[in-house]
């Protein structure tokens, strides 16, 4: 190999190294850092609690909706480095003090790209490709995502034993507030948060024609 070829080879490797570092930096900087959070929302006779906690580098989101007629809770475990990687989701609905109970869970294997879904006596295996979220981590991801507003974002979200493609859009609600809105024909989901701190301010949901306006207290 001539001296000129050696110089060109070193230059080429240096360029590849710089491009690789730039690519890694872009990935790493695409999401803001995550912090532990604790929220309590109220709407009329209902209460909505959300907690994000960390233990030994394992993250956990829990939420609980309490209503005179039902209680809905969910526990999601995930890891977070430069991306959110969900490992397990547990969801429970108790109606009329226990007259009816529904429990479901998802266990995600990121090596085989398979999800074990269990609901009562039913067990199914789902296959996925790319990033996967539940509703809680999807909303967290959208809050942390460092992108321009008014861009449509499509995420694979676990819902009712299926993997659904959900479309969201981030818009500016006020000078210091960002709104996340899910694009769908029925129902409605909107989440408002502070641009700098990422703190949730309000959540608006319309389910089966009934609107819930959850505001932080």
Regions found by a protein language model. Give the residues of each.
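Bacterial N-terminal signal peptides that target proteins for export
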Residues: 6-20
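Acidic, serine/threonine-rich low-complexity disordered tracts
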Residues: 34-108, 150-217
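Exposed, low-complexity/repetitive linear segments and helix-based recognition motifs
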Residues: 2, 33, 131-132
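Surface-exposed, polar helix/loop patches in the mature regions of secreted/periplasmic/lumenal proteins
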Residues: 97-150
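Absolute protein N-terminus
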Residues: 13-15, 32-35
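Hydrophobic h-region of N-terminal signal peptides that target proteins for export
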Residues: 21-32
């Amino acid at each position: 190999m001539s001296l000129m070829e050696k110089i060109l080879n070193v230059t080429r490797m240096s360029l590849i190294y710089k491009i690789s570092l730039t690519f890694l930096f872009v990935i790493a900087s695409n999401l803001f850092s995550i912090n532990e959070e604790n929220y309590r929302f109220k709407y009329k006779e209902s209460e909505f609690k959300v907690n994000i906690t960390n233990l030994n580098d394992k993250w956990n989101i829990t939420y609980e909706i309490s209503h005179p007629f039902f209680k809905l809770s969910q526990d999601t475990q995930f890891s977070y480095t430069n991306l959110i990687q969900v490992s397990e989701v547990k969801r429970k609905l108790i109606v009329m003090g226990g007259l009816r109970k529904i429990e479901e869970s998802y266990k995600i294997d990121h090596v085989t790209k398979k999800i074990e879904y269990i609901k009562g006596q039913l067990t199914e295996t789902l296959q996925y490709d790319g990033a996967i979220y539940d509703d809680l981590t999807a909303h967290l991801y959208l809050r942390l995502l460092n992108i321009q507003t008014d861009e449509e974002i499509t995420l694979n979200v676990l819902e009712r034993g299926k993997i659904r493609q959900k479309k969201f859009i981030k818009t500016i609600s006020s000078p210091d507030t960002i709104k996340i809105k899910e694009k769908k024909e029925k129902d409605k989901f909107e989440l408002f948060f502070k641009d700098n701190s990422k703190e949730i301010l309000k959540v608006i949901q319309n389910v089966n024609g009934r609107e819930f306006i959850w505001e932080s207290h």
